[in-house]
């Protein structure tokens, strides 16, 4: 048949991360869940303080303050103010970018694989 079908990309959840720690590191399930929860809580708290988070080989999370700016209602064309806000940005490391690029597109599955 030859046509590649696009499979739904998987989503890795916090619960699955904890399960992987349980399986690969040998922690018990409660410890694995606590580590995952604590890891993300520390990142969340650092960003809430306005700190950057740098994860070597993965990427950087930063908080940016966006100034107020004029916006436009697309339906009416009316100018509306957009308030100042803080946003989180993520910049992938070169190592992560290379890993993703070299992995190809795992969401593409051949007809033969899809039939299994």
UniProtKB/Swiss-Prot annotation:
Identify a single GO molecular function assigned to this protein. Answer: DNA binding
The family line of this record is: Belongs to the bacterial histone-like protein family.
Subunit (UniProt): Heterodimer of an alpha and a beta chain.
Recorded hits in NCBIfam families, A to Z, give: himA, PRK00285.1
Q: What is this protein called?
A: Integration host factor subunit alpha
CDD domains under this entry?
IHF_A (cd13835)
Q: Supply the source organism's classification.
A: Bacteria, Pseudomonadati, Pseudomonadota, Betaproteobacteria, Burkholderiales
Its job: This protein is one of the two subunits of integration host factor, a specific DNA-binding protein that functions in genetic recombination as well as in transcriptional and translational control.
- Does the UniProt entry include the keyword DNA-binding? yes
Record bears the keyword DNA-binding = yes
InterPro entries for the chain: Hist_DNA-bd, Histone-like_DNA-bd_CS, IHF-like_DNA-bd_dom_sf, IHF_alpha
Question: What ranges does the record list as Polar residues composition bias?
Answer: 94-105
């Amino acid at each position: 048949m030859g046509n590649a079908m696009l499979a739904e990309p998987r989503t890795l959840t916090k619960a699955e991360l904890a399960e992987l720690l349980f399986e690969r590191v040998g922690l018990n399930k409660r410890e694995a869940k606590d580590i995952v929860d604590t890891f993300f809580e520390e990142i969340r708290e650092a960003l809430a303080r306005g700190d950057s988070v740098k994860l070597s080989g993965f990427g950087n999370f930063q908080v940016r303050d966006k100034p107020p700016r004029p916006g436009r209602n697309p339906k009416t064309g009316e100018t509306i103010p957009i308030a100042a806000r803080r946003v989180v940005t993520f910049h992938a490391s070169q190592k992560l970018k290379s890993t993703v690029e070299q992995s190809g597109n795992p969401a593409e599955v051949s007809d033969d694989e899809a039939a299994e």
